[in-house]
């Protein structure tokens, strides 16, 4: 499948350069040559090989936005935006994209932004090199969108903290070598009492309770974790004590932008699949793309993909400029996730019986897309944020 690129694409782009365009092509080629041929196998195995992190690191993809002195490529967040969109556009699958994306997009950025030089050396550098896998631990069995309700406790002791509690729905949780984990460090402190600690897999009391079975994202590992008297040294405190909630909120903006970019990439790919199939599949003596009903479906897919891209790139431009982007990011996340589900569903319909089979990958795209309106903040939470932004 050749991903659709229209002649008006550059007119609405954020500050992309020829270097970013070249990066798109490099990522797209890597995914098509080294990932797509194995996706079905990895989906069945319920994980992709750990060596994929090493290969991505070798190509520089795990450190695109990090400085060269830490082993990164010295790029910027636009490079990371290209990475998120093109993984999906080239067909990496939601599982592969989420596993690599959780490592580069949500788990390591807090370590870079708020970590000490020592933490950079112990955690960020080996993560960039693909030697240590990172995960972010916020969600708990009783606390999802309501972050302030987390109950995992980090009790202050001499020289550090003792952590007790649990986390769930943790992407990379089964294989993560370290977990950037939100804990309560002040009893009854609400959002004011949250801190971030870096928990390491080998710490006694750190347990992977189960590898969770999911509707989609089959090739990524998702875990429930348990912590029983886990002793965490003080040097693993990330940022200031009791200021973790603000770190979470800052990280959420970028996570939601990455989710929007991934959905934009997925819709680009689905549009290409639909166009290709409609041009080749014949019914009643002519390609089905000649029928108005099919043409209109594909036209709507194109509109949704373009609207999603415009909203997302607008939010990205403002985010890069350091502006207040809460409303823009929320709109982009809300629209693209729901639109991607609708686009994938229409693609299944256009392909008919073949859409229901695994050969074309659109049934997987539908299963993968369905997490979008839930993860990173549900649609309902996004609407609540927008309502408040409107003064309601």
Where are the predicted features?
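A short core secondary-structure module
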Residues: 160, 164-208
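Long, acidic (Asp/Glu-rich), low-complexity accessory segments flanking structured domains
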Residues: 229-247
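N-terminal glycine-rich flavin-associated loop
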Residues: 96-118, 144
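A short, Trp-centered hydrophobic/proline-enriched beta-strand micro-motif
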Residues: 130-138
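Short Gly/Pro-enriched turn/cap motifs at secondary-structure boundaries
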Residues: 100, 127, 142-145, 169-172, ...
């Amino acid at each position: 499948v050749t991903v659709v690129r229209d002649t008006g694409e550059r007119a609405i782009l954020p500050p992309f350069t020829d270097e970013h365009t070249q990066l798109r092509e490099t990522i797209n080629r890597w995914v098509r040559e080294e990932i797509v041929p194995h996706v079905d196998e990895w989906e069945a195995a319920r994980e992709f090989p750990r060596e994929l992190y090493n290969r991505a690191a070798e190509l520089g993809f795990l450190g695109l936005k990090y400085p060269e002195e830490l082993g990164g490529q010295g790029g910027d967040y636009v490079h990371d935006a290209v990475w998120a969109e093109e993984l999906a556009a080239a067909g990496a699958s939601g599982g592969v994209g989420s596993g690599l994306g959780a490592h580069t997009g949500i788990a390591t950025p807090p370590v870079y932004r708020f970590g000490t030089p020592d933490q950079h050396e112990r955690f960020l550098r080996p993560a960039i090199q693909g030697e240590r896998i990172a995960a972010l631990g916020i969600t708990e069995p009783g606390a999802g969108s309501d972050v302030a309700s987390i109950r995992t406790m980090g009790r202050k002791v001499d020289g550090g903290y003792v952590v007790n509690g649990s986390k769930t729905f943790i992407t990379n949780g089964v294989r993560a070598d370290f977990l950037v984990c939100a804990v309560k460090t002040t009893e009854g402190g609400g959002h004011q009492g949250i801190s971030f600690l870096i928990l390491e897999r080998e710490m006694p009391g750190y347990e992977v309770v189960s590898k969770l079975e999911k509707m989609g994202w089959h090739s990524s590992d998702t875990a429930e974790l348990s912590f029983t008297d886990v002793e965490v040294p003080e040097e693993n405190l990330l940022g200031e004590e009791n200021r973790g909630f603000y770190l979470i909120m800052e990280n959420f903006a970028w996570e939601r932008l990455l989710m929007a970019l991934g959905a934009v990439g997925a819709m680009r790919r689905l549009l290409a699949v639909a166009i290709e199939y409609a041009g080749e599949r014949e019914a009643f003596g002519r390609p089905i793309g000649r029928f108005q009903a099919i043409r209109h479906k594909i036209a709507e897919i194109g509109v949704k993909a373009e609207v999603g891209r415009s909203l997302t790139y607008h939010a990205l431009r403002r985010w890069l400029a350091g502006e207040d982007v809460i409303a823009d990011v929320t709109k982009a996340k809300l629209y693209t996730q729901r639109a991607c589900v609708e686009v994938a569903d229409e693609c299944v319909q256009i392909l008919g019986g073949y859409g229901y089979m695994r050969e074309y990958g659109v049934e997987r795209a539908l299963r993968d897309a369905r997490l979008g309106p839930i993860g990173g903040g549900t649609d309902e939470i996004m609407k609540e944020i927008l309502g408040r932004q409107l003064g309601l």
